[in-house]
Amino acid sequence: MFKSGFEPVTAEPVFQKTVNSAFIGTNLETYLRKNQICHLVVVGLTLPHCVSTTTRMAANLGFEVTLLADATASFTLSNKNGQAISPETIHEINLLSLQDEFAQILTTEEFLTQVQV
């Protein structure tokens, strides 16, 4: 279930999802509120699908969201005419659609500088 080196630490909660949003069909929201977690840092695959959906829902539920642009990825998509749109273009457009309204968009380095890790 987890890539080697990315396994959860002991007692770390795991929320297994079956749809694009990490909030649908899981107790993620309940866990976050119970533990008074109000700021989420979102990473993962893929940006135009699960990452975007989870980010939008988190913001709509009142959470503060930071999305790490370089810790997400997109794949080539084709439009209805079969024209391939590059992963870089897909990624940039999705980041722009989330920026400010749903999330603060940062690189991992920018985020780590802010939290002084």
Where are these regions (language model features)?
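Active-site-adjacent betaalpha module
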Residues: 1-117
